[in-house]
């Protein structure tokens, strides 16, 4: 069995996972209840709940408390072709109805983080992991 003590700092878990539903409206979204101030975030999945089978571009990225930020995009076109590329948003989703949602981390906060929506064209669920 692996030693899992590295996952805790001072007896408290140093990673936390969750998901957040983002509305189609502009603005910032504060996510709280993490239990610590994160120093990094990883978006591990996106889901367009209004059009669940039509995502053609999905990007999940990461950001640390410094300047490192990147996402990897997977494009799935209607002809079945799949392409990959990279971008600079923390998250990015584009569907077949031409709706786009993208955004970045605004701040790491005492009990979570705040996302800022660059474009908010659809309701989007994002799945994330944060750590310290």
Residue ranges and their predicted role:
Residues 65-108:
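Contiguous ligand/interfacial binding patches
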Residues 15-17, 110-113:
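Short, hydrophobic/aromatic-rich segments at coil-to-beta transitions
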Residues 112-132:
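Short, structured beta-strand segments at or near domain termini in extracellular proteins/domains
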Residues 14-36, 46-64, 118-120:
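Surface-exposed ligand/attachment interfaces on beta-rich extracellular proteins
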Residues 1-19, 23, 129-132:
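Enriched but not universal
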Residues 37-43, 130:
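Short, structured motif recognition centered on aromatic/hydrophobic residues
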Residues 35-39, 65-66, 107-112:
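Short, solvent-exposed coil/turn segments at beta-strand boundaries
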């Amino acid at each position: 069995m692996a030693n899992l003590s590295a996952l805790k700092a001072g007896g408290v878990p140093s990673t936390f996972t969750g998901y957040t539903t983002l509305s189609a409206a502009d603005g910032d979204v504060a996510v709280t209840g993490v239990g610590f101030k994160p120093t990094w975030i990883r978006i591990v999945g996106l889901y367009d709940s209004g059009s669940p089978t039509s995502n053609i571009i999905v990007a999940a990225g990461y950001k640390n408390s410094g300047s490192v930020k990147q996402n990897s995009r997977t494009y799935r076109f209607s002809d079945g072709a799949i392409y990959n590329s990279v971008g600079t948003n923390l998250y990015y989703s584009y569907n077949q109805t031409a709706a786009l949602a993208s955004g970045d981390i605004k701040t790491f906060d005492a009990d979570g983080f705040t996302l800022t929506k660059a474009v908010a064209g659809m309701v989007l669920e994002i799945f994330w992991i944060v750590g310290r």
